[in-house]
A protein has these predicted regions:
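Bacterial N-terminal signal peptides
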Residues: 10-20
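Hinge/cleft segment of the Venus flytrap/periplasmic-binding protein
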Residues: 28, 157, 161, 176-177, ...
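Extracytoplasmic "Venus flytrap"
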Residues: 30-53, 57, 62-79, 83-85, ...
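Short, solvent-exposed amphipathic alpha-helices that sit
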Residues: 42-57, 137-141, 164-183, 197, ...
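Hydrophobic alpha-helical segments within soluble ligand-binding/sensing domains
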Residues: 73, 129-154, 168, 197-199, ...
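Hydrophobic alpha-helical
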Residues: 90-107, 173, 187, 191-253
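Flexible loop/hinge segments that line or gate small-molecule binding clefts
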Residues: 95-136, 144-153, 247-255, 260
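Flexible loop/turn connectors
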Residues: 236-238, 242-302
Length: 335
């Protein structure tokens, strides 16, 4: 009887140890908040890839959507902090909302890493910033046209003007295009990132300039509209098109030979890299307050099979976890 009691006590102690260790392990699991600006596909693909990567790294992740509302974004940041998250990965809505997010995170002692929206005042208060080099992103597209079109008229279909990104893309593209003095930009129209407006813009451009030989379209959603317009008019074979983003439908256009080149800035691999950097900051392995260029990739038919896809598989994301992290760089001049 005494032996049975000893055995029972031993089992109870063992169970308590297991429960204690289990609780300790659970407490040690890091939790990250991913706050996206909207629920649009770009941000959905980014958060999906980050969630898959987090799971493979043994990290818990909670996803918030701010719906382009600064007040909602701040509420998301505050809710994440109240949950006791270890870090925040965020696509901010605006500069003012970034400031509010940084203030709240700093007050709570929670590292916060921004994807886009760099501002020099906020860099030392953050875990880091990551975004693309806007001018540098578009420049190789102009260079490709300069090398692959001997001469002729070029058109540019821009995104929404006034925010600075569309203007920077145009500037970078023109720098690359300038390598061939026989190419002349004869039309530059804003289609506000909208497929239908791009369709209408391309129709008007080709009507006014039926001998156009090249078009730079600043994102692939607009490129779909441009391709549809040129197909309807029977001019698609005449016009070489370059674009940006690397979205699934953009890669489809490349596969079909309707888009010659795109420069991709996949939200998937960018979010995975940003997550890894943030985790490094949290663990004390990476110094906070640095700026990083987001991963980009020029994609044509020749390398389509190795493109960093927005809708990457779990196997692809697992391979990204083995890649070297982006190195910190000197931040771009503030606008």
């Amino acid at each position: 009887m005494r032996k049975r009691n000893v055995w029972s006590v031993g089992v109870m102690v063992l169970c308590m140890v297991v429960l204690f260790l289990g609780g300790a392990f659970a407490e040690d699991q890091l939790e990250i908040a991913f706050i996206r600006a909207t629920g649009e596909p770009y941000y959905q693909y980014g958060s999906r890839a980050a969630e898959i990567a987090a799971k493979k790294l043994g990290v818990k992740m909670i996803v918030y959507t701010s719906n382009l509302d600064p007040a909602q974004e701040l509420a998301n940041v505050q809710d994440a902090i109240s949950r006791g998250v270890d870090g925040i990965l965020i696509y901010a809505v605006s500069l003012s909302s970034e400031r509010a997010a940084v203030d709240a995170a700093n007050k709570a002692g929670v590292p916060i890493f921004f994807q886009y929206g760099y501002h020099p005042d906020l860099l030392p208060k953050s875990a880091g910033f990551m975004q693309i080099d806007l001018k540098g992103f578009a420049r190789p597209l102009g260079e490709w046209m300069a090398e692959n079109i001997p001469s002729g008229k070029i058109a540019i279909i821009e995104g929404t003007l006034g925010r600075g990104d569309a203007e920077a893309y145009t500037e970078g593209f023109l720098e690359g295009l300038a390598k061939n003095p026989n190419l002349q930009v004869v039309a530059k129209v804003s289609a506000e990132w909208n497929r239908q407006k791009a369709y209408e813009a391309a129709t008007n451009i080709i009507t006014a300039h039926p001998d156009i030989v090249g078009m730079f379209v600043q994102n692939e959603d607009m490129a779909v509209g441009v391709v549809n317009a040129l197909e309807r008019i029977g001019k698609l074979e005449q016009v070489k098109i370059v674009s940006q983003n690397g979205a699934p439908y953009g890669l489809d256009l490349i596969r079909e030979g309707k888009l010659q080149l795109t420069n991709a800035n996949p939200p998937s691999i960018a979010s995975v890299m940003a997550l890894r950097i943030l985790l490094g900051v949290i663990k004390g392995e990476i110094e906070p307050g640095h700026f990083y260029w987001a991963p980009t990739q020029l994609i044509s038919k020749e390398n389509l099979n190795v493109a960093y896809r927005w809708d990457a598989s779990e196997e692809e994301i697992e391979e990204w976890l083995k890649l070297p992290l982006p190195e910190p760089v000197i931040p771009p001049p503030s606008s």
